[in-house]
């Protein structure tokens, strides 16, 4: 008799509500100290996340679906086989509007140029964050549409 798949609950929540809720065999994300992967029965963890991609493997074998979600910072908590990501912003790859993401990238690049010309450090920092968010959304969209 085959061993039952070891799946756990993965939830992604933003200030706008629940964005994602499924069972999976692993969740991978970028934490502030590097890339992380959580599997069934992982030790409890609470760690901050950076702008990056969250990948959820929906089943134990490589042929199972992988969901891609763009997140813009937040935290992940894992305990009792439940992973909860509380993100500043999150968007599933299937919901990303590529033209809007590319337009946001162009706007951010223009703001970076403007901030450098004006020597405005605050504007530069905000524009660099906006650029990282836009590039992340484009990357996550591309991961789904390979």
UniProtKB/Swiss-Prot annotation:
CDD domains with a match to the protein in the record = F1-ATPase_delta
The record's subcellular location field reads: Cell membrane
Q: Out of the domains of life, which is the source?
A: Bacteria
Record's Pfam families? ATP-synt_DE, ATP-synt_DE_N
TM ranges are: none
Which keywords appear in this protein's UniProt record, sorted alphabetically?
ATP synthesis, Cell membrane, CF(1), Hydrogen ion transport, Ion transport, Membrane, Transport
Q: How does it sit in the membrane?
A: Peripheral membrane protein
The GO terms describing molecular function are: ATP binding; proton-transporting ATP synthase activity, rotational mechanism
Question: What is a single cellular component term in the Gene Ontology annotation?
Answer: proton-transporting ATP synthase complex
InterPro entries for this protein: ATP_F1_dsu/esu_C_sf, ATP_synth_F1_dsu/esu, ATP_synth_F1_dsu/esu_N, ATP_synth_F1_esu_C, ATPsynth_dsu/esu_N
Q: How does it assemble?
A: F-type ATPases have 2 components, CF(1) - the catalytic core - and CF(0) - the membrane proton channel. CF(1) has five subunits: alpha(3), beta(3), gamma(1), delta(1), epsilon(1). CF(0) has three main subunits: a, b and c.
PANTHER family from the xrefs?
A: ATP SYNTHASE DELTA/EPSILON CHAIN, ATP SYNTHASE EPSILON CHAIN, CHLOROPLASTIC
Family per record: Belongs to the ATPase epsilon chain family.
- What's this protein's function? Produces ATP from ADP in the presence of a proton gradient across the membrane.
What is the name listed in the Swiss-Prot or TrEMBL entry for this protein? ATP synthase epsilon chain
Question: Which organism was this protein described from?
Answer: Lactobacillus delbrueckii subsp. bulgaricus (strain ATCC 11842 / DSM 20081 / BCRC 10696 / JCM 1002 / NBRC 13953 / NCIMB 11778 / NCTC 12712 / WDCM 00102 / Lb 14)
Classification lineage: Bacteria, Bacillati, Bacillota, Bacilli, Lactobacillales
Please state the gene responsible for encoding this protein.
atpC
């Amino acid at each position: 008799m085959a061993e039952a798949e070891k799946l756990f609950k993965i939830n992604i929540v933003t200030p706008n509500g629940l964005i994602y809720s499924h069972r999976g065999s692993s969740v991978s994300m970028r934490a502030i100290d590097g890339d992380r992967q959580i599997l069934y029965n992982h030790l409890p963890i609470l760690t901050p996340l950076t702008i990056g991609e969250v990948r959820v493997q929906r089943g134990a074998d490589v042929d199972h679906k992988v969901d891609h979600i763009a997140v813009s910072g937040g935290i992940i908590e894992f305990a009792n086989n439940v992973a909860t990501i509380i993100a500043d912003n999150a968007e599933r790859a299937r919901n990303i509007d590529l033209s809007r993401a590319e337009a946001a990238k162009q706007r951010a690049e223009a703001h970076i140029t403007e901030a450098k010309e004006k020597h405005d450090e605050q504007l530069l920092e905000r524009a660099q964050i906006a650029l990282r968010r836009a590039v992340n959304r484009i990357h996550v969209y591309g991961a789904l549409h390979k």
